[in-house]
């Protein structure tokens, strides 16, 4: 698979992920959104799988936390540029979770549906987060 195709699949996953959370009501998308990025990460070295997972996570969290820039600017007194940089920093940090998730799931010899069911909640439990934006919050 070409690199451009893999990037497109990771971006697609990142766009679909936030649609499964409150406000949209498309809760199955939080599981379905992982399919394109898992296809992109298939048969890759762990560091490459991590990159695609990280891209997916960055976009997904930005979709969910775009409001942070306004909060940083309005209540934190930051300039708009610093507010957006702060938002990207938070989304990058949180995107690490998806980087690790996709790396682990792509490297396990189990079918992705089984490994996702165990690895995703385990990582969410272990990974310190700022806001409760875990998969359980989407399953309403």
Task: Give each language-model segment a name.
Residues 1-140:
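Membrane-embedded alpha-helical bundles of multi-pass enzymes
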């Amino acid at each position: 698979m070409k690199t451009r195709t893999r990037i497109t699949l990771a971006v697609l996953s990142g766009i679909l992920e936030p649609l499964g959370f409150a406000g949209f009501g498309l809760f199955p998308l939080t599981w379905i959104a992982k399919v394109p990025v898992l296809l992109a990460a298939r048969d890759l070295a762990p560091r490459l799988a991590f990159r695609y997972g990280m891209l997916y996570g960055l976009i997904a969290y930005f979709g969910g936390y775009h409001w942070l820039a306004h909060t940083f600017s309005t209540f934190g007194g930051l300039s708009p540029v610093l507010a957006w940089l702060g938002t990207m920093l938070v989304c990058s940090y949180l995107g690490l979770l998806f980087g690790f998730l996709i790396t682990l799931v792509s490297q396990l010899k189990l079918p992705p549906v089984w490994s996702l069911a165990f690895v995703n909640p385990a990582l969410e439990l272990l990974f310190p987060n700022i806001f409760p934006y875990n998969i359980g919050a989407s399953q309403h």
